[in-house]
Amino acid sequence: MAIRFSDPVNAIKHSDTGDILKLIAQPDMISFAGGLPAEESFPAEEIKKATELVLNGDAGKALQYGPSLGYEPLRESIAKRMNRIVKTQYTKDNILITCGSQQGLDMLCRLFCNKGDTVLVEKPSYLGAITAFNLTQVNFVEIPGDGKGMIISELRKALETHDVRLIYIVTDFQNPTGITWTRERRAEFMEVVDEFEVPVIEDNPYGELRYEGEYLPSLTTFDTKNLVCSLGTFSKTFAPGFRLGWIAANPLFIEKLDLLKQNMDLSTAPFSQRVCETWLQNFDFDAHVQSIIKLYKSRRDAMLKAIDEFFPKEVTHTYPEGGLFIWCTLPEQLKSRDILKQCIERKVAFVPDEAFFTSEGNTNFFRLNYSCNDEATIRDGIQRIADVLKENLK
């Protein structure tokens, strides 16, 4: 029997990232490969109490189907927090709750793009966005950055050359580089985007995890034509197992997204939404975020210190002010995948570069994550990687 699968499914390429993740799942492996939050950061006891409050209250509503836009009190809480942290001017009418921000990526690509359309992404970019957009079978154009954000001259050139339907960026502590866009670059970017009237996805999963400096405003602050769709998530500041994210956008976009949501999965789990909102109302979210910041900052500092102490000077890296990642650049004669194979033999792993690019020929970069290991383990793992690097640079 010949089973015929859809074109988007047939177009999915096998990624050996999954094979790498299987290898690093070994119990004695030091893994800097994942982008997971630390399990000790989850407020498990508080979640237990919030769950009891929900079930002892209106359990029927919590266990029933819910509205496709999401639980209204949670949408209100998200809008208020965004207004305070990233200086937006949202109400609940600007918010739609998603099953994690990954669903938001899928929905927004479906909203704006057809097969063969052009999407601009940073070079490098978040691999989860690339894979989500691939399901719509779009074409990618990569825009390089300079440590302050997208290079504006390259952005303008791409917009003048291509019929661009969508732009995807991570402005705060980007995955994989850890770089944050400056305030000035955000303003320059939106000035150009508003001129060409192209929708923008501003993905911000790590924005609250700032270890020094001040929070920077969302692109919506500089958006004069309501083109920005902001993606947020509770996965890094609450618990990823709840699968709660959101899209913040102008009411027209939200109206269209609501139709998409109704036809995709009816709604995000009402029970998860109500437990999260009950937790927000009964516990100190700000204090919880600060505890996560304290934990991750110490681990980031430990990794940066170990890199500076052990890595050969030919290997450079970023210095993130927040988030979860450090991006390393090898001398061009080295390939990160070859280095990874040798590192795995020494029971330490990272993610090589290829998954973060839509173009070929990017082989001398790798991403390190510091959120899931204690400081002693981080130091040990970095020293193991350094030994491999030194051997390959002799």
Q: What feature does the model see in each segment?
A:
Residues 10-100, 107, 281-282, 349, ...:
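N-terminal small-domain helix-loop-helix segment of the aminotransferase-like
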Residues 248, 327-329, 369-371:
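Short hydrophobic/aromatic beta-strand micro-patches
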Residues 61-197, 207-225, 296, 376, ...:
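Conserved core of the PLP fold type I
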Residues 334-339, 376-380:
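Short, conserved charged micro-motifs
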Residues 203:
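Glycine-centered flexible beta-alpha turn that most often forms the glycine-rich phosphate-binding loop
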